[in-house]
């Protein structure tokens, strides 16, 4: 009986807590650093939303940050190719399939988000990084699904 009452109570609670596990927040600052070196979501997430908050004060032209995701084997090549893609393309090669997800480039005090599907990404070796020229060596981390 106690179990039935507990289940009944739990069924009246608002949206499942699991939904929050599929939404992540990361910060970038004027010292060219993210506040996280690893991000992860459970395999039950069919979509993930990543929000980037730029906690610095410098403008996007001087200390812009974004959040981009690729396979670890590809991220350096993607970041290097992005330098010639320019600011209009968020310093990412346009329509490049190696870019699995990305936000726009933002400056101090701004925020941006990206939502992407996780189909086929569980268990893969993924890296998130900032594609602003020169940032990817320091502003990077691992991204795990599952």
Language-model features: locations:
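Positively charged n-region of N-terminal signal peptides that target proteins for export
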Residues: 1-4
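Cleavable N-terminal signal peptides
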Residues: 6-7, 17
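Extracytoplasmic/periplasmic copper-protein system
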Residues: 20-29, 73-92, 133-146
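N-terminal edge beta-strand
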Residues: 21-47
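Short amphipathic, basic-aromatic surface patches that mediate peripheral association
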Residues: 52-57
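Beta-strand signatures of extracellular beta-sandwich domains
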Residues: 66-70, 129
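Extracellular/periplasmic metallocenter environments
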Residues: 101-146
């Amino acid at each position: 009986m106690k179990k039935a009452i507990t289940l009944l109570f739990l069924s009246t609670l608002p949206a499942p807590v699991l939904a929050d596990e599929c939404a992540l927040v990361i910060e970038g600052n004027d010292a060219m650093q993210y506040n996280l070196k690893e991000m992860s979501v459970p395999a039950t997430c069919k979509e993930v939303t990543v929000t980037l908050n730029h906690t610095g004060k410098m403008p996007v032209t001087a200390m812009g940050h974004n959040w981009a995701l690729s396979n670890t084997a590809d991220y350096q090549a993607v970041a290097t190719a992005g330098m010639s893609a320019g600011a209009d393309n968020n310093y990412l090669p346009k329509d490049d399939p190696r870019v699995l997800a990305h936000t726009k480039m933002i400056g101090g005090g701004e925020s941006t988000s990206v939502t992407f599907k996780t189909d086929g990404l569980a268990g893969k070796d993924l890296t998130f990084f900032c594609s602003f020229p020169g940032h990817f060596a320091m502003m990077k981390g691992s991204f795990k699904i599952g």
